[in-house]
Amino acid sequence: MDDDEIIPKKNHPSNERNKKKAILSHEDFTGEDSLMENHLELRDKLTEDIVTIKASLKNNLVCSTLNENEILALSNYMQFFVFKSGDMVIKQGEKGSYFFIINSGKFDVYVNDKKVKTLTKGSSFGEAALIHNTQRSATIKAGTNGTLWGVQRSTFRATLKQLSNRNFNENRSFIDSVSVFDMLTEAQKNMITNACVIQNFKPGETIVKQGDYGDVLYILKDGKATVYINDEEIRVLEKGSYFGERALLYDEPRSATIIAKEVTSCASICRKLLNVVLGNLQVVLFRNIMTEALQQSEIFKQISPDQLNDLADTAIVRDYPANYNILHKDKIKSVKYIIVLEGKVELFLDDESIGILTRGKSFGDQYVLNQKQKFKHTLKSLEVCKIALITESCLADCLGNNNIDASIDYNNKKSIIKKMYIFRYLTDKQCNLLIEAFKTTRYEEGDYIIQEGEVGSRFYIIKAGEVEIVKNNKRLRTLGKNDYFGERALIYDEPRTASVISTVNNLECWYVDKSVFLQIIEGPMLAHLEERIKMQDTKVEMSELLTERIIGRGTFGIVKLVLHEPTKIRYALKCVSKKSIIELNQQNNIKLEREITAENDHPFIIRLVRTFKDSKYFYFLTELVTGGELYDAIRKLGLLSRSQAQFYLGSIILAIEYLHERSIVYRDLKPENILLDKQGYVKLIDFGCAKKIHGRSYTLVGTPHYMAPEVILGKGYGCTVDIWAFGVCLYEFICGPLPFGNDQEDQLEIFRDILTGQLTFPDYVTDTDSINLIKRLLCRLPQGRIGCSINGFKDIKENSFFADFDWDRLAGRLLEPPLISKSETYAEDIDVKQIEQEEEDNANTEIDDENWDIDF
């Protein structure tokens, strides 16, 4: 749809909200910190003090999810402050850093110099300061002599981090000790650790009862518990012991009663939550064993990961008793490969034992490679066992045919072309068509495959042999098996820049012609590839750029539309003020932004061409995106239809999935950070909040309305926070307003609504698939959030909301976008002269250069 065909729905709530700004990750030393130093007194906490502090913390928004031990630990970090009547504690409009609990006296609250209420013992104030260094909304003075307990934000959040890390590491060590989890991967064990729920039991309280059907595994973290069978005491369990592991695998009665001997704390994992996070545990365990065994096979390690997973899914799993002939040389017909999942089996050839296979071991490479060969071996169980059988039909279903060589050949071609930008984002259908179009040709030693100066029309991959690259009669380099050359000939009519000569007899190459390629790749995708390659080929110097317009403005500077005079290619130049970076302590973040942006290579993510710097600015030269912000587009479109929401959310999902695969969490997903290109497709921009994440992060960063609960709570988070933002965006697309805190500007109230508010939908939203997906994306527990299980983004893509959506056509730019701008649209459009004075003022500011940007 073109933008001149759209009549905005002016009364629609989505037109009403202002653009939202992100919170930056930094800590300032505030005036409040200095003030508190003058009122600090050392004092031990009495029992009644601990009671008062704990009661107040339990009512605190950020502390609402903490357990008793965590509350007690935080209480220990509270400091004692003394104030005289009339003393100011906090001042309206200034940045806050402390949270206070009144120990004695009265404290008066003023808003705009008007007294609005008086607080007394047990009351608390400054809660927002525990989350972020936001401005105080009121002034508070001591109405009488009084005392306060207080804690500084950095201390509070550092304590939360320490407690969370300690708890996670302890739970993870317990998980490692449970034998049923032995065959799980590190990622799977971490997911189970995150799913642990702490349960506390009083002395004499029954944890599990003999004969009851259970679905929970318990691991003792603290305390002791007694085991009884038929009312007879059997033994005492202590810290690190676990029980109920079979409840995760089987629906059977408990074999014993276990009663807490003293105050006891357990980490518990229930089967239902485990199924959400990981899937059926037994299936996952067997699948892991099969996948690992297949990866050890000389044959199967050459097929794709997807094909490996398909084989593991389609393998036939069977149970066998002890001393049973599982496979007999005279009776085997279709089985080609076996994997031992449980137990031991013995392998025979010509009635002679040739080895014993245990769990995780496999056999059958020779029969997979030559499927017409008659099975000569016999397999006999030595004990009760479970075996995975891969048959001819399994191989045919997963590999497309029974020819394993053809499948390996196909995968080699695919792995090669997927490394090249020109082919990387072809749809599966396009990729298959391209690979099927490859033909084989042979050359002898000295033959020219490509002649320098000739206009080419073929792309080559070396199947076997070697070639040398020669330019101006000078040998440049040698290429061998699986190397490629000539790919530019598929897009451009230009002379070959070098000759390629065979250095061996019987050189074998795969090739595809330009005419075939253009039948497969056409329209928007071809135009996109041409522009992308042209942009990347161009070498740009700062002195060659001519500023035409100012097209954007942000916290740290401006974005210019610039022209590269030698080539007439236009770019966007983001100019970042070093002064602003230093003032806001963003030195590390700007370096990280450069690193992440430079590595990104995805059609739905802004492409960085190169960076520059001088004494006052950093410069990011990127592709120019001319279609305006998604923020404005959804206001032109009004309420999005299902197909429109699918297009935009699907595009965002593909971009974020690319980042998560590289362990990058974006942390500021919102329509303001998404541009539309001239074809109407999305471009994710602004990586100022992004981070390479290993383990968990604790920084409060992002735009409040789009923040996931785990970011606010400060107990650690991972890439799951971006998936929460999917839910916020989808809600905004189809409902109009934001799901939480839509009418709020006060950050504490926004956070309160995110953590405790009810998710409701307007009456005009009736699409149940949309509603259900939003509910699952906006699940406050990350481990229960769709897209956060071991299946990852697959669960979202296969959700019923996307049932009629073609992901292949989206990636291949074959879908019609909801909005295509007929004219260039930018966030701002300012004449250069209007901003020259600002640049001059900045240029006259001295920067304390400590070489922190030496690698920029």
Curated annotation (Swiss-Prot):
Q: Where is this site: Part of a catalytic triad required for cGMP binding and cGMP-dependent kinase activity?
A: R488, Q536, D537
Q: Where is this region: cNMP-binding domain 3?
A: 299-402
Listed InterPro entries: AGC-kinase_C (IPR000961), cGMP_dep_kinase (IPR002374), cNMP-bd_CS (IPR018488), cNMP-bd_dom (IPR000595), cNMP-bd_dom_sf (IPR018490), Kinase-like_dom_sf (IPR011009), Prot_kinase_dom (IPR000719), Protein_kinase_ATP_BS (IPR017441)
Superkingdom of origin? Eukaryota
Q: Which UniProt keywords apply?
A: ATP-binding, cGMP, cGMP-binding, Cytoplasm, Endoplasmic reticulum, Kinase, Magnesium, Membrane, Metal-binding, Nucleotide-binding, Serine/threonine-protein kinase, Transferase
Q: Which residues bind 3',5'-cyclic GMP 2?
A: R477, G486, E487, A489, R496, T497
Q: Where are the transmembrane segments?
A: none
Identify its protein family: Belongs to the protein kinase superfamily. AGC Ser/Thr protein kinase family. cGMP subfamily.
What is this protein identified as?
A: cGMP-dependent protein kinase
* Organism expressing this protein natively: Plasmodium berghei (strain Anka)
